[in-house]
């Protein structure tokens, strides 16, 4: 019998990430087959279109089945991408913030593992029969260092800043080891930045721009847009960066004294808005938001 396929999944508030994919964490249920099977999961007699916008923020991701359903979609995407058989065994590797790792580890493992194996479902019309043999959980952020150990080489202390959709998780590494007493979680993720930016544009210009438009301009990419709205987005990106750096300093991290490794979906935005006047010691940015998921697989 072949060994189980190891699939790393980063269950973000804003996006689901695997080694090869990143897609929005929204999900919409239908009682009948939708007009297209693209990104459509069929499970338990219902149809779910995965990657549609974003879902309401859940303090507890285990409150409903949405993240389990998104997990099945992520598994199917990875199986197809890797050229594996649709009937197979997998080991899931997922992550949790270090601040709540001990509290959430057991229930989140049970949430993903469940009792009825194998799991039978269809994704984009293809039937899958997947046995989830095990679920391993790892600290978010720290797992990315498994991919880029050179970032902490010769650095006695560094700050990991994982800028996600809803939270920004902070953790200091001393001699390459996480210092658990320094873990902080700030509710200052990119969703906050995007929502406040859209509201500012509505007030100042009277336009209703989309999340996707705001994200693209924040990332420094071209798109057709009213120039006043574009200017507001760029200004809000800088204001968000200032606020985040200030909150990190208030949490006890002297960013002028120790290097910062930024990762997560917001890393590129914040790195692009850091200026010399901020006086930061040194900033590294892992701008691929899939780096945590890849690290989980190590």
Predicted features along the sequence, with ranges:
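Nucleotide/phosphate-binding catalytic cleft detector across ATP-hydrolyzing
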Residues: 1-158, 177-192, 212-298
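Conserved active-site beta-strand-loop modules that form the wall/rim of enzyme catalytic pockets
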Residues: 157-159, 166-171
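Short, contiguous, pocket-lining structural segments
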Residues: 162-165, 189
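Short, acidic (Asp/Glu-rich) active-site segment that either coordinates a divalent metal cofactor
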Residues: 168-174, 182-183
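Acidic, metal/cofactor-coordinating or nucleic-acid-engaging core segments within structured domains
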Residues: 201-204
